[in-house]
């Protein structure tokens, strides 16, 4: 390695050596390694710390460039190293990443100024990650400020240290511990723990934390920052700390990092900490337990976690850890993307019901489908079948400030039908961020506790009308045009979990007790050979849907199909970039939020639909430019479609991901921030190759008939200005 290619070092050390050389040996302690600190030592350390802090400041990093974040992982795990190059992007063609003094990899520089590489985590230890910018001849032309830490866990129990302990001025309103954290940290290290720091906040406070760690001479370790700002999540004053904390612990364990303990400003033996099997302690508790000799229990817990990981497949381990779901064998699954067939199958299932029909919808709106649904349910109720019907209060306009949905009123008039509006808003005092954003987005149907439908369809014509069933001419309103949607029908032991999910919500929302003679949880025998799991996300309580999608992306080796038409949350965007970095094919089938004619022009529609279309496509553009194959759905020709071209480009409402012809997810969860954080969702993950291959064959047929979006095409370019303006101005609260 030449001098100009010297690997990134601690800036304080580099400044120290330069200063010593200039001083001509005046202060030999500088290079002799003397522990006493000279004035020059202190100046070099202070200036170096300042430069490192600049490299950790998000705003300065975007301007001047720098490595994005510290990483904590385990040996052999895939690790993404990323950097923003800032103004340095203009100086070269390649970014060269270093891990300590070794070149870890290179990435070409494009117009985004963002670079990333994937490596396999090295042996346990603490490594410095830096980046240099090189020209087309491989010569270094710029050295980015600062470095980040790659911490590879050793297998010892890991304690996450809350930043509030070292940043007392940032923990406003919280009691600060009387015991200095340094004493507790030393005790934990002496007992065999490995340390890492974490912060959960609206803003990215990484630079302040780093500065304080240096000032207090605290042990170096990765600083893990979970900020709403970086997730483009508008929190609207809602406290996300518990949700992000459990997410952080689960994600680290999924990577083989045995987190057993959290060191924070107050003891919290809470339901959440018990559920995550983590011990929460204050510094004083640590010292007390160290004296009592009871800190060593964590080592056995860490060892057991690593043994469990070694016994599991990568997919099962990640889903087990990040979603707290369990795989259930012995099921049969059937997917349906044809709206007309879905309607006929659903009504046939109602006719087959002998004891109970349980239904949950997000939206129930006036439509021909809904009228038929109401009649069918009343018929079955009068035939002796008990019907339990749940709707989201806000989006079905039921029990919100006294409002009543007349469709639901007809159901409530029947003796054998019970109706609940989930999360009603009974007075203006209840109107607030949580009541408006924390909604129940699930769509479930369970027949006799033996058959279930988990899907994305609401009660409306656009969800249950086939593209060949609706007359469409050039001036047909967007609202009349069907959407692409999907459900998965389940029979077998997994149905019990769907039923239990429904019943938990039913009872939590005040539903009537189940009669003793009505067995809503019958014993279920295997009906097939397919394994699957139910992923349930509770809004503001966990991030199970987000974790499900990230886990599926992270285990993919060959290809991924995504069917969705919502802006993708940054966590999943980064996961998609990791897919592309390891040459995994990514096909994204989307639609048009305002339906288009075959030539790409819009059908008549409300303005907000067209603005939403521009915003979503604007959010997809970086993925398209990075290498994602983006397709806009086009329906087959139909005698019922007489609009120009004889075909339409409809909205895509399905929420479907399929990976490697091995595993598929279908349900209610979009890939956006609303589904990831705010609303409650339910998806089924089918871990069966035959099912996945069948679904992917359907998707590929849809893609073959669709329009491949090309950033250089006139179709894409003609709306570029609109996308740019709307993406910039669209209020984040609407899609986060």
Predicted feature descriptions by range:
Residues 195, 220, 259-260, 278, ...:
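Hydrophobic anchor at the start of a short beta-strand
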Residues 2-161:
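Non-catalytic pre-domain segments flanking phosphatase-related domains
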Residues 192-194, 205-301:
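C-terminal cap/substrate-recognition subdomain and adjoining C-terminal extension
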Residues 60-79, 124-126, 130-231:
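Alpha-helical substrate-recognition element adjacent to the catalytic core
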Residues 166-174, 202-204, 267-270, 364-366, ...:
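Short acidic, S/G/P-rich loop/turn micro-motifs used as interaction or catalytic elements
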Residues 163-167, 268, 449-451, 662:
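Short, glycine-anchored, charge-dense loop/turn motifs used at functional sites
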Residues 296-736:
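Charged, low-complexity intrinsically disordered terminal segments
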């Amino acid at each position: 390695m030449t001098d100009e290619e010297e690997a990134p070092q601690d800036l304080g050390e580099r400044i120290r050596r330069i200063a010593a050389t200039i001083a001509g040996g005046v202060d030999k302690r500088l290079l002799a390694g003397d522990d006493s600190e000279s004035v020059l030592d202190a100046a070099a350390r202070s200036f170096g710390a300042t430069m490192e802090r600049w490299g950790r400041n998000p705003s300065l990093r975007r301007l001047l460039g720098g490595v994005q974040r510290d990483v904590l992982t385990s040996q052999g795990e895939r690790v993404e190293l990323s950097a923003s190059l800032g103004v340095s992007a203009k100086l070269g063609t390649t970014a060269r990443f270093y891990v300590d003094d070794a070149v870890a990899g290179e990435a070409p520089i494009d117009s985004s100024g963002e670079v990333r590489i994937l490596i396999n985590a090295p042996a346990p230890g603490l490594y410095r990650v830096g980046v240099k910018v090189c020209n087309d001849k491989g010569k270094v032309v710029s050295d980015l400020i600062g470095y980040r830490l790659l911490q590879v866990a050793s297998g010892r129990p890991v304690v996450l240290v809350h930043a509030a302990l070292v940043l007392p001025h940032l923990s406003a309103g919280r009691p600060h511990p009387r015991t200095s954290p340094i004493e507790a940290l030393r005790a934990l290290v002496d007992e065999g723990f490995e340390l890492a720091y974490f912060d959960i906040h609206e803003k990215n406070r990484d630079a302040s934390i780093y500065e304080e760690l240096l000032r207090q001479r605290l042990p170096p370790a990765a600083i893990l920052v979970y900020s709403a700002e970086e997730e483009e999540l508008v929190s609207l004053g809602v406290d996300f700390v518990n949700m992000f904390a459990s997410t952080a612990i689960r994600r680290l364990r999924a990577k083989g990092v045995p987190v057993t303990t959290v060191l924070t400003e107050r003891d919290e033996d809470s339901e959440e900490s018990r559920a995550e099997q983590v011990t929460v302690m204050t510094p004083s508790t640590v010292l007390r337990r160290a004296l009592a000799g009871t800190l060593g229990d964590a080592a056995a817990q860490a060892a057991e976690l690593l043994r469990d990981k070694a016994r599991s497949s990568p997919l099962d381990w990640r889903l087990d850890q990040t979603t707290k779901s369990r795989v259930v064998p012995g099921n049969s699954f059937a997917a349906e993307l044809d709206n007309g067939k879905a309607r006929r199958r659903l009504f046939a299932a109602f006719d087959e019901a002998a004891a109970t029909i349980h239904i949950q919808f997000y939206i129930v709106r006036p439509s021909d489908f809904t009228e038929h649904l109401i009649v069918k349910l009343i018929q079955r109720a009068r035939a002796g079948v008990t019907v339990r019907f749940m709707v989201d209060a806000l989006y079905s306009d039921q029990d919100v400030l006294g409002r009543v949905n007349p469709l639901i009123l007809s159901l409530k008039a029947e003796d054998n039908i019970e109706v609940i509006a989930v999360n009603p808003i009974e007075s203006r005092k209840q109107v607030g961020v949580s009541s408006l954003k924390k909604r129940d987005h699930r769509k479930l149907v369970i027949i006799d506790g033996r058959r279930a439908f988990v899907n994305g369809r609401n009660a409306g014509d656009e969800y249950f009308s086939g593209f060949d069933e609706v007359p469409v001419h050039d001036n047909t309103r967007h609202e009349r045009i069907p959407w692409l949607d999907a459900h998965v029908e389940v029979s077998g032991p997994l149905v019990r979990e769907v039923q239990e999910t429904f019943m938990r919500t039913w009872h939590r929302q005040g539903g009537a007790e189940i009669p003793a003679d009505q067995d809503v949880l019958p014993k279920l025998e295997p009906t097939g050979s397919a394994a699957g799991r139910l992923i349930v996300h509770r809004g503001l309580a966990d991030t199970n849907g987000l974790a499900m999608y990230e886990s599926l992306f992270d285990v993919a080796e060959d290809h991924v199909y995504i069917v969705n038409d919502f802006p993708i949350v940054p966590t999943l965007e980064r996961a998609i970039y990791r897919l592309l970095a390891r040459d995994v094919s990514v096909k994204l089938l989307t639609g048009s939020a305002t339906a288009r004619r075959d030539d790409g022009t819009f059908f008549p529609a409300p303005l907000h639909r067209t603005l939403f279309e521009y915003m979503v496509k604007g959010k997809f553009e970086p993925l398209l430019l990075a290498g994602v194959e983006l397709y806009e759905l086009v329906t087959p020709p139909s005698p019922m479609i007489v609009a120009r071209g004889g075909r339409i480009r409809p909205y895509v409402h399905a929420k479907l991901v399929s990976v490697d012809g091995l595993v598929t997810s279908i349900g209610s969860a979009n890939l956006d921030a609303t589904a990831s954080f705010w609303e409650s969702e339910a998806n089924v993950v089918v871990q069966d190759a035959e099912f996945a291959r069948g679904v992917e064959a359907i998707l590929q047929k849809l893609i073959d008939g669709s329009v491949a979006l090309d950033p250089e095409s006139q179709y894409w370019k003609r709306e570029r200005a609109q996308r740019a303006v709307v993406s910039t101005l669209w209020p984040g609260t609407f899609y986060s």
